């Protein structure tokens, strides 16, 4: 290389370095923080400022979080912090720590000046309220919830954070002694911190979108319904989960609190004494005192999700169905994956994924019965009949297995999402409502050929993995990812997924009560991807036919839990006798029927 070329290259690099904007140290309510500035090309230019591990709150065991007191000097925010204490996948050990309430920020930067007034997207992770972290799963330091691709492609600020999970996040006695919802309050504290501090990072505190998947999606829904977040949230996106999901609210927290108390040696007759004892118990012992059964359980696995949000009369003041007035001015996108129920079906009916094993009518009826306990034998039979109508014409194992997956998808995700969309639309003032179905098939080679999009399959596309790790993906995967990032970030910017900095493949029309408009997201998105009346027949069955069946009260119509086995997780209660009463209401605020959905 000649001397002139070397001089030119050196000058180019110097100019790039000089022109590249970066934040440096940022002053927050807790003190100064300094992250790292990552260049997006060798010659400089665009970059992203990354801050990892900023504390936003502190919390004692089984108590509400408090604002972080701050620090001296400049905090070097360059590494992710450990996740909140939780059980390992094998449920025989723990990892993480109690000191875990930290957040991470990605800020895209241009060439000449630091970003200003950018939309802010705050991510809430899923994991059954039992596991997870703000950075997500890690493979060779490639973290699932790395916000770089969303931030730089959509020109938005991305924030992720940790919140408490499992017993430490959601254990409740159902009264004031241990009200629960500690994990939800952690989430609220993170959102409130962003509201107070994000302007210093170049964000618009009046344009915050919260988004999440699964338990994170239900959390997003609950945060929009909680009066604590009034004025904090402008928009929301729920991917495969809502506050109305049957696994999102624990109606019998005392049952599970007593179960934990017995295992760790705390009293169970007096909730005050129980709470005092649990608060001084080794947090790891509390965490390991609960195990989610994933084999040979009597009921569908979601019935064993013990430590989840509760109606506490405060943060969640009432049944979520009664709180949709609180979302009247919050724009909303909600949707599901077309085979979201597959993950749960493989636990409840293991033969679904086994090519050499068959699913029987008895298998499916047992599954249906487990999900329709409240309506007794009539509910189980009516549900079984409508879902097996196609079996007479096509009794193949493929059809039967797809029926199992479709049923779990409907019960756990589609029906609650459709009802929530209708509630949001019916109560909207300025708010806009959008619906989608993610149908891009799973890339897992071990799955059957008929498999669609499993639970959580959408995450890799929303977080831009086909671009971050291109060797593992096809061009069609990058097309899906590009479209999702464009729709999501446009929505965060304007409240309309079609309007923003990023072009989209087709116009996404809003949801209506009459037509139930939704965007079908797959490898080719065209005008034909806008569809109506998703699974109308089954939605009508659940919202009308099933709903009007009498709720059983007699033992003859309920499933009887098997005898207790100390080696396995306890069986969920089968009736309402132990359910914690809903806070008293008057006639003006009694439980509402869902908004009418057009059929």
UniProtKB/Swiss-Prot annotation:
Residues 559-588 are annotated as: 4 X 11 AA tandem repeats, O-glycosylated region. Glycans are attached at residues 207, 325. It comes from Mus musculus. The lineage of its organism: Eukaryota, Metazoa, Chordata, Craniata, Vertebrata. The gene is Cel. The keyword Repeat applies. It is found in: Secreted. Activated by bile salts such as sodium taurocholate. Disulfide bonds join 84-100, 266-277. It catalyses: a triacylglycerol + H2O = a diacylglycerol + a fatty acid + H(+); 1,2,3-tri-(9Z-octadecenoyl)-glycerol + H2O = di-(9Z)-octadecenoylglycerol + (9Z)-octadecenoate + H(+); 1,2,3-trioctanoylglycerol + H2O = dioctanoylglycerol + octanoate + H(+); a sterol ester + H2O = a sterol + a fatty acid + H(+). It comes from the Eukaryota. Residues 553-599 are annotated as: Disordered. Keywords: Disulfide bond, Glycoprotein, Hydrolase, Lipid degradation, Lipid metabolism, Repeat, Secreted, Serine esterase, Signal. This is Bile salt-activated lipase. CDD domains: Esterase_lipase. Interacts with CLC.
């Amino acid at each position: 290389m000649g001397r002139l070329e070397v001089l030119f290259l050196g000058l180019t690099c110097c100019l790039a370095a000089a022109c590249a904007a970066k934040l440096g140290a940022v002053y927050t309510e807790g003190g100064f923080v300094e992250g790292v500035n990552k260049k997006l090309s060798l010659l400089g230019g665009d970059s992203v400022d990354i801050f990892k591990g900023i504390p936003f709150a502190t919390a004692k065991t089984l108590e509400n979080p408090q604002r972080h007191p701050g620090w001296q000097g400049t905090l070097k925010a360059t590494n992710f912090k450990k996740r909140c204490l939780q059980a390992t996948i094998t449920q025989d050990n723990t990892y993480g720590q109690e000191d875990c309430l930290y957040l991470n920020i990605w800020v895209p930067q241009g060439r000449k000046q630091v970003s200003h007034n950018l939309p802010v997207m705050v991510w809430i992770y899923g994991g059954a309220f039992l596991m997870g972290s703000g950075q997500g799963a890690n493979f060779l330091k490639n973290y699932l919830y790395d916000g770089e691709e969303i931030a730089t492609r959509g020109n938005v600020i991305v924030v992720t954070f940790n919140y408490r999970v499992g017993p430490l996040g959601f254990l409740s006695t159902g009264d004031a002694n241990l009200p629960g919802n500690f994990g939800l309050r952690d989430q609220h504290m993170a959102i409130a911190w962003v509201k107070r501090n994000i302007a210093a990072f170049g964000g618009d505190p009046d344009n915050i979108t919260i988004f999440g998947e699964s338990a994170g999606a239900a959390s997003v829904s609950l945060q929009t319904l909680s009066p604590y977040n009034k004025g904090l949230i402008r928009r929301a996106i729920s991917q495969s989960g809502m506050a109305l999901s049957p696994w999102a609210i624990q109606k019998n927290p005392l049952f599970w609190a007593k179960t934990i108390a017995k295992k760790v040696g705390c009293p169970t007759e007096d909730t005050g004494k129980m709470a005092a004892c649990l608060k001084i118990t080794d947090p790891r012992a509390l965490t390991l005192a609960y195990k989610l059964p994933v084999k040979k359980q009597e009921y569908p696995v979601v019935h064993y999700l013990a430590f989840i949000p509760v109606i506490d009369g405060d943060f969640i003041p009432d049944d979520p169905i009664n709180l949709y007035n609180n979302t009247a001015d919050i724009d909303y996108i909600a949707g599901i994956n077309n085979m979201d129920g597959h993950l749960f079906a493989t636990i409840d009916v293991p033969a679904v994924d086994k090519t050499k094993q068959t699913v029987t009518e008895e298998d499916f009826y047992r599954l249906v019965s487990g999900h329709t306990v409240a309506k007794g034998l009539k509910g189980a039979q009516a549900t079984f009949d409508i879902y097996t109508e196609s079996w007479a014409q096509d009794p193949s194992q493929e059809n039967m297995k797809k029926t199992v997956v479709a049923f779990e998808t409907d019960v756990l995700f589609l029906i609650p999402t459709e009802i929530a969309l209708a509630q949001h639309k019916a109560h909207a003032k300025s708010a806009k409502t959008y619906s989608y179905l993610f149908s891009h098939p799973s890339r897992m080679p071990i799955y059957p050929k008929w498999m669609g999009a499993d639970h959580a399959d959408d995450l890799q596309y929303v977080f831009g993995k086909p671009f971050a790790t291109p060797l593992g993906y096809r061009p069609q995967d990058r097309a899906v990812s590009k479209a999702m990032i464009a729709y999501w970030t446009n929505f965060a910017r304007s409240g309309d997924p079609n309007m923003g900095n990023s072009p989209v493949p087709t116009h996404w029309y809003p949801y209506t009560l009459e037509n139930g408009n939704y965007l079908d997201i797959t490898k080719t998105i065209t005008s034909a991807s806008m569809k109506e009346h998703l699974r109308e027949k089954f939605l009508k069955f659940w919202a009308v036919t099933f709903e009007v069946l009498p709720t059983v009260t007699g033992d003859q119509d309920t499933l009887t839990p098997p005898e207790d086995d100390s080696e396995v997780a306890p069986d969920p209660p089968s009736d309402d006798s132990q359910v914690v009463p809903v806070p008293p209401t008057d006639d003006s605020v009694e439980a509402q029927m869902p908004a009418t959905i057009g059929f």
